[in-house]
A protein has these predicted regions:
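Conserved Rossmann-fold NAD(P)-dependent oxidoreductase catalytic core, especially the SDR/UDP-sugar
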Residues: 1-30
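Short glycine/serine/threonine-enriched helix-capping/active-site loop
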Residues: 5-6, 54-56, 124
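Short beta-loop-alpha junction of Rossmann-like oxidoreductase domains
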Residues: 13-15, 62-64, 165
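Active-site helix of classical SDR
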Residues: 32, 36
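Short, surface-exposed alpha-helical segments at coil->helix boundaries
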Residues: 38-41, 70, 74, 132, ...
Length: 171
């Protein structure tokens, strides 16, 4: 069984805020990263091989070697640990689907062990929060940080994925 880690960013071209996107929603990749993931998803679907595609939300969490600080929760954690200022573009209204790294690892193991799950696509996400809510959680954990809302535009205000199909497998 091929377990392919894809990404929620295959929906980045959706212009309006959309919530609870299901796996059968038409993808709208824009940039090369999401386009390559969507292309590889389609190649797997046509291959005739047994696969599971996991569309990961923004993965966050502790890493022993190199933590990606271009992911909003990780960047906010770093800034919070340094008593810095969290800048909230568009007032922090962007919607984000988040998943902890530990859940990603657990899901890969779960899918590998489930022989009855074949040729399926699943959204792997745990929480849907606005950027402002994540910042408020950081502020609660470190009252010394500052939150600065801006009116700067963002490409889109985000979207959220539904994980109901995945949860129905017993995960």
């Amino acid at each position: 069984k091929i377990i392919f880690p894809s990404t929620h960013v295959v929906y980045e071209g959706i212009e309006d805020v959309k919530t609870n996107i299901k796996e059968d929603e038409k993808t709208k990749p824009v940039l090369s990263y999401s386009s390559s993931k969507a292309f590889n998803e389609n190649q797997l679907k046509k291959s005739g091989k047994n696969y599971v595609i996991l569309r990961l939300g923004s993965v966050y969490g502790y890493s022993t070697d190199s933590m990606r600080i271009d992911i909003m929760p990780n960047l906010f954690s770093k800034i919070t640990s340094q008593n810095g200022t969290l800048k909230l573009f568009a007032g922090g209204r962007q919607v984000k689907s988040l998943v902890p790294l530990i859940d990603v690892a657990r899901c890969f193991k779960f899918m590998e062990e489930k022989n009855n799950i074949k040729s399926e696509v699943f959204n792997l996400t745990k929480d849907t929060l606005t950027v402002k809510k994540v910042a408020e959680i950081c502020k609660k954990n470190n009252p010394k940080i500052k939150l600065k809302e801006t009116n700067d535009e963002v490409p889109n205000l985000g979207f959220s994925l539904s994980n109901k199909k995945l949860l129905n497998t017993g995960f």
